[in-house]
Amino acid sequence: MNLVRDIMSMEWVESVDFGVPARQQVGSWWTPSPSDREIAEGILRGNLRLEPHPNWVFGSQIEWDADPFNQRNWTFQLHSMKWLDVVRRTAEQSPEDSEFARFWVHTVFDWSARYLNAVDHPVAWMDMADGMRTIEFVLGAKLVPDDLFREYLDILRLHAEKLADPSRRVGGNHGLHQLQGLLVVASFLRDDELKLSAATDLVGLFNSEYDVEGTNKEGALAYHDLNYHWWQLAFDRLELEGIKLGSASRRLEDSRKHLAQFVR
């Protein structure tokens, strides 16, 4: 059975914007690569490699509390779900192979059954991981069967609610990823007020991270480059949703010029 939905036949088509998952597949974590199917097949066999850590072998169910390498970064990546996108991409590229879609859907709902209401869990709801996971959950909307779609929307709404909560918001690049997640899910849910709030907060965060000349407050040179790419991705997401940036975009380009001067 082909689990990749025909969105034109859905009763949900007016309540959400299915253009969002299509156009928000931007950035290196969310775009296809030649090795996608090989990696996805490995994951379905129970092999998960979260760089730079060694391979982890899991059974028929993912052990969400696992910490095999005693590494916070590993558990962060596990709960961020960015590793799951290779399965989503393979499911959408090979709809005749329904096992990929089933795995993606099962993983999303399995995680949600355990952690959706455990918002104080120190790992599952880590800042930045929550924003990245939200993006992944939105991008796979076409894979969710009709009989699970209402529950799926509840999962997204809960993520949107938590990302919109100022008390859970952090600064820096972690906050940047939280706000990108909020922008994407608000756009998908057609929540224009929340979408505008995410955009406003993104610009506010940018203004707190960059001075008027486009210099980032992060001291390390490597982070100047990372921040440029992260912010460029965020600005791309805003523009994909029809939000113009004006002076903020120009200041980001100025920061790129500063970086070029540093490395001369």
Name each model feature, range by range.
Residues 47-65, 74-79:
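Short alpha-helical hairpin
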Residues 260-263:
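Eukaryotic acidic, Ser/Thr-rich intrinsically disordered low-complexity regions
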Residues 1-58:
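Extreme N-terminal leader/anchor segments
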Residues 4, 21-22, 56, 66, ...:
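Alpha-helical protein-protein interaction elements
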Residues 61, 71-252:
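Aromatic-lined, polymer-binding surfaces characteristic
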